[in-house]
Amino acid sequence: MSNSGHPKDRGNRRGLMLVLSSPSGAGKTTLSRMLLEEFGDVKLSISATTRPPRPNEVHGEDYYFKTPDEFHRMIERREFLEWAHVFDKHYGTPKADTVARLEAGEDVLFDVDWQGADALHDQMPNDVVSVFILPPSIEALQARLMGRPGSTPELVARRMEDAKREIMHWRRYDYVIVNDDLNVAYQRLKRILLVERLKRLRQIDLEDHVRALLGEA
């Protein structure tokens, strides 16, 4: 059931950027989906990309589809919080869209690797809350990857090497969750979100409230 939060609370706080990273197979996508289903005021970040749309993908909902020239102009105008070149295509996070959502009191969820998390933090350090999801063991991670459709020993071996490289950067994150029980991991992620929403720097009306209490309004 969606929980959009108290309308007054949303209006009186600045949203946050919840950045999730993990090695492939650690459960990040499932945890993200659970959070989006429960909290109506948490929105998934929409990336811009130069790859062509797949069937049923909608511009402005799944991605912002751009030509290479359009994408490069956005880079030149510094319109991205972060961008990357992946398999001959470009992907990037438009800054204006994220800022508008934060100012509206919405939280924006990011699914990025450690380099993307670093770039987002460099651009907007006061807004980023970063969480790294770890598997309970290397054996469990390998079993999850082997269980995916289309997996081959070669593909799993490559993903395991990628996973170890990603795990090496766990200390860069504000929070770390070991996903050995999905429901427990989700409750921890949810508590992180709720506590971070209450931080002083996100309560945008507090300064006026304190001035009124002190008779300075």
UniProtKB/Swiss-Prot annotation:
<dbReference type="GO" id="GO:0005829">
    <property type="term" value="C:cytosol"/>
</dbReference>
<feature type="domain" description="Guanylate kinase-like">
    <location>
        <begin position="15"/>
        <end position="194"/>
    </location>
</feature>
<dbReference type="GO" id="GO:0004385">
    <property type="term" value="F:guanylate kinase activity"/>
</dbReference>
<protein>
    <recommendedName>
        <fullName>Guanylate kinase</fullName>
        <ecNumber>2.7.4.8</ecNumber>
    </recommendedName>
</protein>
<keyword id="KW-0547">Nucleotide-binding</keyword>
<dbReference type="InterPro" id="IPR027417">
    <property type="entry name" value="P-loop_NTPase"/>
</dbReference>
<keyword id="KW-0067">ATP-binding</keyword>
<keyword id="KW-0418">Kinase</keyword>
<feature type="binding site">
    <location>
        <begin position="22"/>
        <end position="29"/>
    </location>
    <ligand>
        <name>ATP</name>
    </ligand>
</feature>
<dbReference type="InterPro" id="IPR017665">
    <property type="entry name" value="Guanylate_kinase"/>
</dbReference>
<comment type="similarity">
    <text>Belongs to the guanylate kinase family.</text>
</comment>
<dbReference type="Pfam" id="PF00625">
    <property type="entry name" value="Guanylate_kin"/>
</dbReference>
<comment type="function">
    <text>Essential for recycling GMP and indirectly, cGMP.</text>
</comment>
<keyword id="KW-0808">Transferase</keyword>
<dbReference type="InterPro" id="IPR008145">
    <property type="entry name" value="GK/Ca_channel_bsu"/>
</dbReference>
<keyword id="KW-0963">Cytoplasm</keyword>
<dbReference type="GO" id="GO:0005524">
    <property type="term" value="F:ATP binding"/>
</dbReference>
<dbReference type="InterPro" id="IPR020590">
    <property type="entry name" value="Guanylate_kinase_CS"/>
</dbReference>
<dbReference type="InterPro" id="IPR008144">
    <property type="entry name" value="Guanylate_kin-like_dom"/>
</dbReference>
